[in-house]
Structures are given as structure tokens and as C-alpha cells.
């Protein structure tokens, strides 16, 4: 049988967190003959792994020939925000069950995307199922070392400046390494209604009245839901003043929440005053997208311990947790 030509001119497009479309060129004489495609897909760090031989049990992707471009989809082998290399080989399955194969194409590299809004909406729905009842609170707070606040006063005009969010949480979160903001907490102790006296982030705490950051002029977005191999679950929310740079970033990427009616964090008017509530059964991580003036709040030392084991800095999400994972790239 006549040999097959080697595929060439690979093109990758329509990339998502767990899929991509691929096409390539081959000789016209092969179009009617080819019955299967072999696709060698590797994470970039493994791009030098040996390609499988057609006589072996395939360890890569095998697909029946379809018109190109074709979509490759699968959360079990594609992760978001991950660099991959891909090469293709065409084949004709013969009557004896063996394959006549082409040479391998050139290798092309690409990077998968972030979670889309519909994926985040699925995470949001899962988070809502365990959020629990709503508790009142009155302040947002941020713990850090004393030197951090001294630096803000001395070198930053008494302002807490936004910084780039780390890679904690879901690997596919569009905020990781992209959104600038200042991290705050709002959870309270059940028995006192006050912020806890322990913190993993430092013994000095800045507290600011909730209405300074959260009010009808603020948009609220859902950003992530994750855990760190423990029973605790975390939800990341973004507070962005309407029309701000942070608001424009979130608008196209994150689900927008109704500030007066959602399962995580609310601001509503009761008896002419703003009232704030947070979900009892989630640890909320709040990202405020603008600089925060220290003069708008108070700074003091907490009486409890610095519980480093609870820090979420660059924390990796447990990919096996059924509570906070969805069936797309993780």
C-alpha cells in the first residue's frame, strides 16, 4: 500500500480550559484513505517523552478520522492554564488490524485557558450548597506583620496598595496572577459575632467599617471555591467599585452577584441603615480592587495566635474533593 504523507502546518485555536480545536494539512490523496488520527499530547515539561509506536497499545489519543478541524476535549487529561505540546500522525487501519501510519508531524505548543463564566457558575452553585446561614458583621479586617503597615504609612501615602493575587485556589481561576487587589476577611466567631482573635497572616490587624468597602456603589463577584485537603472550604469574592479597573476586569470573567441577595456576602438596607451578612460555613476571602486608606479604619494587635497552618498563600486546591470540584480541567 502507498505510504501516507506526513501531516504538517498544525493549527490550534478555540482553546478553553479543557478543550482545543486542531487542524493540519495532508496530501489530497490521503484524505479518502485515512481512517484514524493519533494525537500525542504532553504537558510541556514532558514534551520529550517517547511517542507511542503504532504496534503498541496506544497510550496517547486515538480518534477516528473526521473532517478537520476537530475538537479535542477532556478534563481527565487537560488542565487549565497549562502548557502542552502536540503532534499528530495519520493512519489507515488495514484488514489484518494493523495500521499503516504516516510520520509524526512537527510539534506545536499551546497553553490552555482559564475557567469561563459557565464553569465559575458551576463552582458558585456548589459553594451555595454548603454556605450555611447568614451572620451579621460590621467590619472587614486584614492581618499582617507590623512592618507591612509601617511601610504603607511611610512609603505608600498611608494607603494599602493592591497587589497581584497569588495562585491559591482553583488552577483555572481567571483571577490568579491577573487581578490586583487588597485581601480582606470578614468571618466572625459564632459565639461573639466579632472577628476571631487568631490569624495565620500576622498579629497586627487593620479593621475598616464594612460600608467603606461594600455599598450600593460596589459590584460583588464570585471568583472561586476550593479547599486544601481539610474540612474547611473557602470562597473567593471580589469587591470592585463600579466602573473601576477591577470592575472592568471582573465584568467579562466572573459571575456578578446581587449584593442584597446571595448566599455569601450581602449588603442590604434595613430600617434605613446598611446591614451586612456573611455565610457561616465558608471562609470568605475578599479581594478589594482599589487602594485602601489606613485613616478610614483602626490598627491594633490581636491577642490570639498566628496559626500558620491555616494560611492560604499559594495554597493548592484538593483535586479529589467532590464538594468543590467540577467536571472540567482542575
Swiss-Prot record:
Domain named Fibronectin type-III: residues: 6-115
One example of a Gene Ontology biological process annotation: protein localization
Keyword entries, A-Z: Glycoprotein
Glycosylation: residue positions: 14, 325
CDD domains in alphabetical order: FN3 (cd00063)
Role according to the record: Its interaction with PHYH suggests a role in the development of the central system.
Name used for this protein in its record: Phytanoyl-CoA hydroxylase-interacting protein
Protein source organism: Homo sapiens (Human)
Amino acid at each position: 500500500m502507498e505510504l501516507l504523507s506526513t501531516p504538517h502546518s498544525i493549527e490550534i485555536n478555540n482553546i478553553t480550559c479543557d478543550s482545543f480545536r486542531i487542524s493540519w494539512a495532508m496530501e489530497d490523496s490521503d484524505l479518502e484513505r485515512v481512517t484514524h488520527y493519533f494525537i500525542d499530547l504532553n504537558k510541556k515539561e514532558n514534551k520529550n517523552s517517547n511517542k507511542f509506536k503504532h504496534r503498541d497499545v496506544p497510550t496517547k489519543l486515538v480518534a477516528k478520522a473526521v473532517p478537520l478541524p476537530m475538537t479535542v476535549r477532556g478534563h481527565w487529561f487537560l488542565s487549565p492554564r497549562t502548557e502542552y505540546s502536540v503532534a499528530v500522525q495519520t493512519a489507515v487501519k488495514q484488514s489484518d488490524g494493523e495500521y499503516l501510519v504516516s510520520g509524526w508531524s512537527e510539534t506545536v505548543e499551546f497553553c490552555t485557558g482559564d475557567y469561563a463564566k459557565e464553569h465559575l457558575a458551576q463552582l458558585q452553585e456548589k459553594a451555595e450548597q454548603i454556605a450555611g446561614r447568614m451572620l451579621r458583621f460590621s467590619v472587614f479586617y486584614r492581618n499582617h506583620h507590623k512592618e507591612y503597615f509601617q511601610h504603607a504609612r511611610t512609603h505608600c501615602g498611608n494607603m494599602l496598595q493592591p497587589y497581584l493575587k497569588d495562585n491559591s485556589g482553583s488552577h483555572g481561576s481567571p483571577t490568579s496572577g491577573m487581578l490586583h487587589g487588597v485581601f480582606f476577611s470578614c468571618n466572625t466567631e459564632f459565639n461573639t459575632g466579632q472577628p476571631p482573635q487568631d490569624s495565620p497572616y500576622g498579629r497586627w490587624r487593620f479593621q475598616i467599617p464594612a460600608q467603606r468597602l461594600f455599598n450600593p456603589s460596589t459590584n460583588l463577584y464570585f471568583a472561586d471555591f476550593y479547599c486544601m485537603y481539610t474540612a474547611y472550604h473557602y470562597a473567593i469574592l471580589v469587591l470592585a467599585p463600579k466602573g473601576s479597573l477591577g470592575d472592568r476586569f471582573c465584568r467579562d470573567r466572573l459571575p456578578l452577584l446581587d449584593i442584597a441577595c446571595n448566599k455569601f456576602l450581602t449588603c442590604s438596607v434595613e430600617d434605613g441603615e446598611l446591614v451586612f451578612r456573611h455565610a457561616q460555613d465558608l471562609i470568605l476571602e475578599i479581594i478589594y480592587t482599589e487602594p485602601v486608606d489606613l485613616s478610614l479604619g483602626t490598627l491594633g494587635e490581636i491577642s490570639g495566635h498566628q496559626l500558620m497552618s491555616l494560611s492560604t498563600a499559594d495554597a493548592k486546591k484538593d483535586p479529589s474533593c467532590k464538594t468543590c470540584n467540577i467536571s472540567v480541567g482542575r
